């Protein structure tokens, strides 16, 4: 009787997604080594599965149902192991919707080898299976690297499930929903527009649903077609990104034919070394066989999902295109590879697999889509601010900054982690260049992430440091970042600068309608004005306290502003309290507010602050 050993899970663990990758070994009995291992699921909630054993190693994907599960592993020589595992649904987390975008006249088919199924029902089966592979792969990467069994959530509902070809037709389970979104464009229009317009076509199709915000969508264009005469894939683009409220990834269906359509087909597909016919796309010239094509299609779409989660291009991993070996996360044997000329690999161990980069997983650890019930909650309204002193730029977020990334040439080149996260993180230009090996004339971008998942990107930090310094009659003062995008082409106003010992305002008068017209600072009977006196005046008494910050509503212009005092008192929002995006500025510790700057068109389209 062979002994069964599970390497990546223990008894009575809690998991948070429907399918879980299991790594294990079987101990040989004398000269006999089992060739397969069988998995029986809890109370026959899912058909029994058989997985290959290679040189004593196996990988299996188990199915779990909400609550307690008993999973039985057996070998053909009587080896047996029962695994107890608890599946907790994360019903409060944001979820990813998976969808096909189809033309308004689409025939609802996709490119496939002659004679193969290629209707919308088969497409749904394949895309559903790919989504669960993304989720299980991510959860295993996170667990393996010490971040817990966490992954992004997929939109699911009780409906006929297709994740096993052995289930009776119509068997209902809680399974991934694959949405079908009709575009206003015809199929031929989708195939004819410049590729970058496909992102907007998909976004328009999602926008028509009028979904609650934020939303997360991964979309595949079903009407993608490969043209052998031009060797072009029409109706395909690989893009992912969006705004804080709208996250969108898009991809074409040119490799969908190679995807597994059920759990029983995962290993066969990733073991299928048959050549792709010349009338089908060979994406990136890395899709010559069925298994290589599946890697590129499933993996590249996961790469775009990574962009929607905020991941930039990384030094290695999924975000550098390590997905041509995506198959290795689910198989113990790799077959002939046209891309590399390799004749195969066996056994395929965990060390041979692709993964998310360490920085991606660190980002996921704090991402709202990956939140576990035991995770603390951080206030979402706290912004990351920065200030300059001397040659140093300091980033501030009271929830804790956990990562600063430095990017140039389209890729992360250096970073600094903070474990535990810190409320303030300071760097000089020289330190940034040292961390990223950037030359003295290399432009770079700095990205700062905090535990409440606020992210700011700054280009050209040396210029920010240089321009922040302003010489006044009472010495060097420092300029804050500018709030408002100068969308009205406003003219620069004269700076208001008042020596610290004299900056003791008695009240602030805000002039506004549905946007900020001006701020008037009173010192007894005297006042200074930034902007103009349009709109209506609104007075806020300071009463011997100090101004320590502002809440600003802004976008193309400054919609409104609120004043924060040292004694804890906060003014109402003056202007449009619902306009633009909410930003906050707090005077750093050890500094004092000494003035204002900004620009004025029909109303103020930017504002900033001076500190000393």
UniProtKB/Swiss-Prot annotation:
Occurrences of domain Jacalin-type lectin (ranges): 477-612
The keyword Ribonucleoprotein is assigned to this record: no
Co-factor: note: Binds 1 zinc ion.
Coiled coil segments of this chain: none
Alphabetical list of InterPro entries matching this protein: Jacalin-like_lectin_dom, Jacalin-like_lectin_dom_sf, Metalloproteinase_M10B, Unchr_Zn-peptidase-like
One BP term from GO: proteolysis
Keyword match Plastid: no
Entry GO MF terms: carbohydrate binding; metal ion binding; metallopeptidase activity
Catalytic activity, EC: 3.4.24.-
Binding site for Zn(2+): 303, 307, 313
Cofactor(s) of this protein: Zn(2+)
Active site residues per record: 304
Keywords: Hydrolase, Lectin, Metal-binding, Metalloprotease, Protease, Zinc
A GO CC annotation given for this chain: nucleus
Family: Belongs to the peptidase M10B family.
Protein name (record): Putative zinc metalloproteinase C607.06c
Organism encoding this protein: Schizosaccharomyces pombe (strain 972 / ATCC 24843) (Fission yeast)
